[in-house]
Amino acid sequence: MTSDHRDALFSLELESPDPDEGGVADGGESDTDEDLRDNDDVVMPGTNEAEAEDDDPEEEDLNSPSTSSLPMVSTISATAVVSGTPTATSSTGAVTVALPAGSAVPVSVIPVDSDPKWHRMTEIVHQRPPIDDSRRLFQRLWTDEDEIELLRGFLDYMTMHRGSSSHPPDTAPFYEQIKSKLQLDFNKNQLVEKLRRLKKKYRNVMSKISSGKEVFFKSPHDQSTFEISRKIWNQTGKIIGFEDNNVMDFEETNNHHNTTNGNYSTFNSPSSNPTLELDSENGIEKKLTMSSSSVSRKRSRSRIGKIEEDNKPVITPSDGPIASNVNLNEAAAVGIGGNLGGLIEETVKNCVSPVIKEMMNGTTSMMMAAMGGGFPGLGGGGGGGGGHGFGSLSPMFTRPFNFGFGVEGGGNKAVADERWRKQQILELEVYSRRLELVQEQIRTTLNELKTMPSGI
């Protein structure tokens, strides 16, 4: 029994592996594990993942002095073959460049997948910026066709509302009217600004014409714009919200001299004494001769009135009623709907101005005669009291001539004084009748204006 038990124990010891001989017993390691551990180029599958991530040179800073000064390129990614199965330690693919030790060539790692952040920055730099919406504001809003349509609509609006009331028309109704005709998106301020610019453009052309310069239109559109603008702003009256005080008034531009050729593209100014054909306020064409000195400068209303008065013939008492009748016939010819203000003003100027002038001349001569400054008589007699002053052209309120015949204080002088007195009475009666006609015409016109409907 003892021998059999001993033999069994001995056989068991022979079959069990000896731990000193490298066998695996009770959780010991085999020779294969030791060989794999001694190999530096092989990664054990049982190693800690955190240690593998710390040893991964891809996570290190490439610009650090510790890595840039290494003579040997460390392995970025390695593949270990354990039990015939490849295992990758890095999830990101990369290109590994290895150089021998002691090489001074700089090392660069080129990643296969580029950084998306760098990709986005490159797109922002090289992408063409979009067109800014603010630049579209400076694009032209009104085309040539729109300008013509706008001026025509404004001309119709002014023609319809001119003379309908004492107040000037407003631009608000016109904005509502023209907005439906134009295929544009504009507001009232843009409309008023466009009309103001067109008016200023027209005034600039008229100022060049008044200064004697030749005006050439660049295109047929400019010519058409000027012709329509002349029909609009060549009339009196202003528009609410459309006043422009920086330009000349109608009176300064209505009498501008302009002679046009067939296509109205050139305005020439004659050099001396041009004969102008103008439309007066009552619609009657008149020919007026003006000196060249008044052509080269702008004229105010008083200047124009003075030129017209100087160029008119002297109206004698005999032709006064005839002139008044002519004016009345002209007013009847053009109709009551015309502008009667100019007719009344012209009638008063034709009738009253000579009366005032004659009275002023007569008063001056009487004052000079009273002061002893009259001219001596033709027959001698230096201070003979019968001298006639500077009012000799006007016999009103003047003393009779002393021709030197007879003796002062004789009967001939008394007869001459009586004849002059009768002549003065006749002249004053003529002027009185003329003034009565003017007053009657003014009353008639006033009654017609009061009874006239406002829509005409």
Curated annotation (Swiss-Prot):
Q: Which residues carry this modification: Phosphoserine?
A: 16
InterPro entries in the record: GEBP (IPR007592), GeBP-like_DBD (IPR053932)
Q: Where is this region: Disordered?
A: 1-71
Q: Which GO terms describe its biological process?
A: regulation of DNA-templated transcription
Q: Which UniProt keywords apply?
A: Phosphoprotein, Transcription, Transcription regulation
Signal peptide position in this chain?
none
In which domain of life is the source organism classified? Eukaryota
Compositionally skewed regions (Acidic residues) per UniProt? 15-38, 50-62
Q: Which Pfam families match?
A: GeBP-like_DBD (PF04504)
In which family does this protein belong, per the annotation? Belongs to the GeBP family.
Name of protein: Probable transcription factor At3g04930
**Native species:** Arabidopsis thaliana
